[in-house]
Each structure stands twice: as C-alpha cells, then as structure tokens.
C-alpha cells in the first residue's frame, strides 16, 4: 500500500521503527485500528518492505501531506509500558545508538523484517561412541565429508543443530543424509530434544537457615520492597556466603506483594542451576528467556510475562527488556561480570547499569550481587548512592578454603624445563583422586598450542584476515583464528616468510593440551573440558555440567566459563594454572579482572561440608593483585586500585566514551578518525580530555582495520551531542564505519 492523503485519517501515530533510524516517523491510523494505544507493536511499511515498530504517541494532527498507513498489529501482541519506552529513549541517548537499533533490544521475540518461521533440526548419533569410532575409521578415507560429520558429533556432548553441524564440518546436507540412510544418525525436530524439567534438578536445593548478616541484608531489601520506592542494594558477599538464598527470599517477598521479578545471570549456561533452584521454590511462576530460544518460545514468554501469568523471569542481559507486569524487583547476579556489556554492535549497553535505570523508572528495588564487586558499584555503595550489605562468612556447612601461592619461577628452576603443572599441584590432584573428591582446573586459553611458527626463520603464523596468532586445535587438526574463527584449509606446506619447506614448531598451551597431559600423568582419570570448543552446540554446556555434578568425571578443566556461579559439592581442590596471565594486558581494568577471576575460581572449592583448597600458580608472586587475591582481601585490592584510578582519571572518577573507526584501508580509516578528532578538539571544553587517535589492540579483524580515541567526561549525554555534531560535520566516507562504546569494559582490545 502506497502513500495516502493525510486527511484520510482521523488519528496519526508516531512510530519508532525497528531500523537504523534515529527519529520517530508519522503513520496514519486506519479506522479499524483506532483502538491501539501507546507502546503497541505494529507492522508498517518502510522503503518498500515490511518492518515492525512500536507506537510512541497517538495524535490528531501531522505535518505530512501524504502518509503511509499502519498495516496492522504485530503477531507478537507486545505492548511496551511507559517505563520501557522511557528506558528505550534513555539507552538511545546515553549509549549513542539510533532509536530503531535500540528498539530491537525490546522486541527480541520478533524480527524487524516480517518473515516466516522456520523449522529447526538436531542431529543425533544412533550408535554408541565406540561403534561410531569404528565406523569413522572406515569412512574418513573413502568419504571424508561423512568422516568430518562424525568427528564433530563425537566431539560434543549433546546433539548439535543441523545448520551448526553443516557450518562446523564445512559440508552440505548430502553427507548428513547419507549417514542417516546408513542408520548411523538421525535428524530430528529440535523440540523432541529440549531439556526436560526433571533434568534441571541435578543441582538439588537445600533449606537454609539465615545467619545474622543475611538477615540484615534481607531486612534492608524487604524495607525497599514494602515502600515501593526505588533503591539499589549492593550485596557484597564472599563466594559461598548465601547470596542465592537472599535472592530467593527477596523474590518470595515480592510475590507476596503482587510484584514480579527479573533475575539476570551473566551467561545462558548459568540459567540451568538458577532455574533449578527457583523452580524448586516457585514452580510454574518461573520462566526463562535468552537468545537461543526459538522465536515462538520467546514470544510466548514475553506474552505470559506482560499478562502476569509468569512472575519470575531468569536469563542473561536480554531478559532485562521483557515487559513484566508489576515489576518490583530486579536482581543482577555476579554484577561485576564483563558478559553484561554488549560489545559486538550498538547500543553498547551495560545490563547492570540499565537494570538500575529500569528500576528507577519502574519504582522497583534493584539488588546487585557479587563476591568481587566492580569498582564502580563498590564506590557507589561507599558514597551512600547504593545500600551496602556485607556477607563476610560462608554459609552453614561450608568451611573457609585454604589458599596457597606457588612461585612458578622456582618450580621451573627445580625442573630445569618449562612446566604446566608444578609438583605441589600434581601431588594435591593425586590426593583428591585417591579419596574420590573432585578437582577443578582453570586455564584461560583454549586450543592445544597457542603459537605455531616456522622452525627455520621463527615466523609465527597469523590469521591472514586478522592481527591474531593462529591457535592449533589438535582434535580437529586445524589452525584456528580466535577472532574470526577462520582456519586455513590445510596446514601450510611452505613458510610465507622464508618460503622454505614448512616444519612447524608448536609452543604455548591451551585447555585441550592441559587435558591431554593430565590423562598421560593419571591414566585412569576421568576428565570433562568446558570451553567454547566443547560447548558450541545447544545444550552441550548444561549436559557437561550435569555430568560433572553427578560424578561422571574426576576433574573439570576449563576457561573462564567454569569460574561463574557453579556449585559442586564434591569439589575440594581448585587449581589456577596461570594466575597472572591477564596482568600483562595494557588495560586499566586488567588488575580488577584478574582479581575477580581468581576469587571467583577459588570460590568453587569447598562449598559444602568438605574442606576446600585453592592452589594459584604464578610467575608474578609478588604482584599486589596476586597477593590480594590469594588472601581474598577485596578491601586491600580496592584501596590500591582506586588510588591509581583517581590519579590517572579513570572510572569510577570519570566516564569514558570510546570512539572506534573501522575500514578496509588503514590510511583512510586513520584520516577519517583524525577528522572527527580535530573537530572535537575545537568543540570540547578542557573538562573533557580528548585522548589521541591510536590503533586498537586488535588492530585488524576480518580484514577491517580499527582506530580509536577516548573522551573523558563527568557527563555523557552533553558530550554525545557534541560527538554527534562532529560526526555530521566530518561527513565520513561510507567506506569507514564508526561505533561508540560508552563506559567500555576495555580501552585496549
């Protein structure tokens, strides 16, 4: 339907359109839709296509002589309340993102383009792993593509999606269908394989008696809930101190008052344990929302939440934008976690800070929980902006864990060679295996070897598309770029630098090699490895965690994915193999993130009646961050870190705005960044320091070169207006894109 005379309509609507547009557009309201209200999701025409938008305002006049009509209501039946509309505009202004792009956060259950739903399938092995390996040995020579499919299926703990399997194995559907005809695998509807309710109970809840500090925190939160006034509480509790029990009781109190709750967790994987605990307490009132759900599941959850039939919602950052009826409580668990920050595309929002703003707009109580609070949150608590509650002791059955620091410089001298496991660590692992207790090993690098070079000229192999060293993954026998996930089709036969015959020299280690070494030292050991290689497919993370929690393995090896919020009662030893690795990164948050990571990993040990022990290997044993982490002394760490932040004018004493410019030509990208930078020099006041243009830490990603500069300011929105003006004046080349990251988690990468 084309443009119509505006006089045809009695009512007009200002619509926020789900497109890259930073303003509302006027549309005519047909007579049959005159009942629609502010916040209603509608279908409209834009540039010849159908889009979804949300009505911002109904009015009786328009400045347009001709106008497009609203086509109809969106199938999602979503209506955004006033507080979410206000939040949408605030996010757009604060995080420097077009209204249309920001709107997509609030409508995750539907596409901005109206498309037909598609069926999703999973691929399941019909044979045992042993039998499949026999079949693989016969097939991989005669039918390499079928062999590639079976290798992927054997590698993962749960059935992958059909499209994911095709992409990972780099095959069409043909070899998969051939294997299906041979009776080796099945292709089934994903709905048949959804995680059943009874599988969620492998983390059994136990009734808890509150200790005095917990009771004090509960009293403060209950007081906020009863007054229906906005307050933000920082629940600062050491690992294992009973923060989850406080979440449960606060949620129960909110329900008694007829209020709903949103509980945010950093990653999807953590929803399994959390949902288990909450469903055991609240039953069908609990819902889950995350981006891996189907569109129909997301639409159903949003509708139930907005109608009030679903009163508790658990999920990662995307769950924050659900239109809950009578929202009274927002909980952000592990509030310090970097996963709460959106970094891939605008708006680059931080879910913790947006949660606080949503609480303010909805007159709700906000609870931020962490054993290692961000410096920003702790500073807000000390200043009185947040209500502070401390939990300084572990819950009833748990004992304080013993922590030891191992100087790897001395261990290397003793062994006269490079080692990954010190003798004290191997001894402690052997002791746990002897008595049937479990061990957790943290190593924050995946793959087998992290550096591959030419033995002749020592040239290190890098990704041709990125400024990144390639990592060798032994199981798949590939060199992989961890930035763009590309890999050479075959291992190189000649060196690109000296042109000689390529004999590869392998250095460095990842979780895959750690697992292999452990199996060589302890032949009977049962291991589970959790990293982004073993958890690519839907349900794989949950399956591996369930296997470990139910005693199917002795040792859990993993990257930072295993550091967050997991509660394994039989784990009595946590080993951090490379405690200082993050300290070498030239970033103002490096020490904070290392301290948080060590503390969180250490907190996985000794969480029940069995005493726990933590071993930290480090080549920087005298570093103050390592010492504070070893003593679990947050106050000491905060005191030393906050002094440096204030001296150098970094958060929490100032706001940072990171301006990133990206283009295929490095010279042109640098020039365009400088053009904007020079305009801002003239516009910004001396109270807003402007840092020079520099290459990003990851200078080249996917054949795109990246430059950046930083702006420091006490107030973001006024600077954003000047930045917008500078970008308009600069008239950037269409070949150079930009992204604005307000309150960045890193100023390096």
Swiss-Prot record:
Motif interval(s): DEAH box: 333-336
Helicase ATP-binding domain segment(s) = 224-391
Cofactor (UniProt):
Zn(2+)
The signal sequence is none
| EC identifiers of the protein | 5.6.2.4
Q: Which residues bind Zn(2+) 1?
A: 454, 457, 495, 498
Cofactor binding comment, as recorded: Binds 2 zinc ions per subunit.
Which SMART domains does the protein's record reference?
A: DEXDc, HELICc
Residue intervals of the Helicase C-terminal domain: 490-658
Record-linked Pfam families: DEAD (PF00270), Helicase_C (PF00271), PriA_3primeBD (PF17764), PriA_C (PF18074), Zn_ribbon_PriA (PF18319)
Q: Which top EC class is named for this enzyme in its record?
A: isomerase
Reactions it catalyzes: Couples ATP hydrolysis with the unwinding of duplex DNA by translocating in the 3'-5' direction; ATP + H2O = ADP + phosphate + H(+)
The protein's GO terms of the molecular function aspect are:
3'-5' DNA helicase activity; ATP binding; ATP hydrolysis activity; DNA binding; zinc ion binding
* Gene3D superfamilies noted in UniProt: P-loop containing nucleotide triphosphate hydrolases, PriA, 3(prime) DNA-binding domain
| GO cellular component labels | primosome complex
Q: Which residues bind Zn(2+) 2?
A: 463, 466, 481, 484
Oligomer status and interactors = Component of the replication restart primosome.
Name the record gives this protein: Replication restart protein PriA
Q: Which organism is it from?
A: Chlamydia pneumoniae (Chlamydophila pneumoniae)
Whichever gene encodes this chain, its name is: priA
């Amino acid at each position: 339907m084309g443009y119509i005379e505006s006089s045809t309509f009695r009512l007009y609507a200002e619509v926020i359109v789900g497109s890259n547009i930073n303003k509302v557009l006027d549309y005519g309201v047909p007579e049959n839709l005159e009942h629609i209200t502010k916040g209603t999701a509608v279908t409209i025409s834009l540039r010849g296509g159908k889009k979804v938008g949300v009505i911002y305002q109904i009015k009786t006049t328009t400045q347009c002589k001709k106008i497009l009509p609203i086509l109809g209501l969106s199938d999602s039946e979503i209506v955004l309340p006033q507080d979410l509309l206000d939040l949408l505009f605030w996010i757009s202004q604060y995080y420097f993102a077009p209204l249309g792009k920001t709107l997509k956060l609030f409508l995750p259950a539907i596409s901005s383009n109206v498309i037909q739903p598609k069926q999703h399938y999973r691929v399941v092995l019909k044979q045992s792993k042993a039998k499949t390996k026999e079949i693989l040995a016969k097939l991989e020579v005669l039918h390499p593509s079928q062999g590639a499919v079976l290798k992927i299926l054997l590698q993962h703990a749960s059935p992958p999606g059909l499209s994911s399997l095709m992409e990972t194995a780099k095959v069409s559907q043909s070899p998969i269908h051939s294997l299906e005809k041979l009776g080796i695998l099945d292709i089934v509807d994903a709905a048949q394989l959804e995680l059943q309710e009874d599988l969620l109970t492998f983390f059994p809840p136990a009734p808890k008696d509150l200790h005095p500090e917990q009771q004090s925190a509960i009293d403060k939160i209950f007081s906020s809930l009863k007054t229906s006034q906005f307050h933000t509480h920082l629940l600062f509790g050491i690992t294992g101190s009973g923060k989850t029990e406080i979440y449960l009781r606060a949620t129960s109190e909110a329900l008694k008052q007829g209020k709903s709750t949103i509980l945010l967790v950093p990653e999807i994987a953590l929803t399994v344990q959390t949902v288990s605990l909450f469903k055991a307490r609240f039953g069908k009132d609990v819902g889950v929302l995350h981006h891996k759900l189907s569109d129909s599941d997301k639409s159903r959850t949003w509708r139930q939440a907005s109608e009030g039939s679903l009163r508790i919602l658990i999920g990662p950052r995307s769950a924050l934008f659900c239109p809950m009826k009578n929202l009274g409580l927002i909980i952000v668990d592990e509030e310090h976690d970097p996963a709460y920050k959106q970094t891939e595309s605008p708006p680059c929002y931080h879910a913790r800070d947006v949660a606080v703003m949503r609480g303010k707009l909805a007159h709700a109580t906000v609870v931020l929980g962490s054993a290692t609070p961000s410096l920003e949150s702790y500073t807000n608590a000390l200043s009185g902006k947040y209500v502070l509650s401390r939990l300084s002791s572990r819950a009833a059955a748990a004992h304080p864990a013993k922590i030891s620091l191992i100087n790897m410089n001395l261990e290397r001298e003793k062994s006269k060679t490079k080692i990954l496991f010190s003798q004290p660590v191997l001894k402690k692992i052997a002791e746990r295996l002897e008595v049937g207790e479990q061990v957790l090993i943290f190593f924050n690098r995946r793959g087998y070897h992290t550096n591959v070079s030419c033995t002749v000229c020592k040239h290190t192999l890098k990704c041709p598309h990125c400024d990144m060293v390639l990592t060798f993954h032994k199981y798949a026998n590939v060199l992989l770029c961890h930035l763009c996930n590309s890999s050479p089709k075959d291992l190189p036969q000649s060196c690109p630098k000296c042109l000689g015959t390529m004999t590869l020299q392998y250095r460095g280690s990842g979780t895959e090699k750690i697992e292999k070494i452990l199996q060589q030292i302890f032949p009977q050991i049962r291991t589970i490895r959790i990293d982004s290689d073993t958890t690519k497919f839907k349900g794989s993370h949950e399956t591996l965690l369930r296997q470990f929690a139910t005693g199917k393995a002795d040792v859990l090896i993993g990257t930072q994915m295993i550091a967050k919020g997991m509660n394994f009662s039989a784990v009595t030893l946590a080993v951090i193999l490379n405690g200082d690795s993050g300290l070498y990164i030239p970033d103002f948050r490096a020490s904070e993130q290392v301290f948080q990571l060590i503390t969180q990993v250490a907190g996985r040990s000794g969480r029940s009646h069995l005493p726990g022990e933590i071993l930290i290997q480090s080549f920087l044993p005298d570093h103050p961050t390592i010492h504070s982490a070893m003593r679990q002394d947050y106050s000491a760490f905060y005191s030393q870190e906050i002094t440096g932040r204030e001296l150098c004018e970094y958060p929490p004493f100032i706001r940072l705005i990171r301006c990133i410019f990206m283009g295929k030509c490095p010279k042109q990208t640098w020039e365009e960044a400088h053009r904007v930078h020079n305009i801002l020099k003239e516009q910004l006041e001396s109270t807003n320091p402007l840092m020079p243009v520099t290459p990003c830490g990851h200078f080249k990603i996917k054949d795109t070169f990246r430059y950046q500069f930083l702006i420091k300011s006490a107030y973001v929105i006024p600077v954003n207006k000047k930045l917008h003006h500078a970008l308009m004046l600069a008239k950037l080349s269409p070949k150079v894109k930009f992204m604005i990251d307000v309150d960045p988690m890193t100023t390096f990468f």
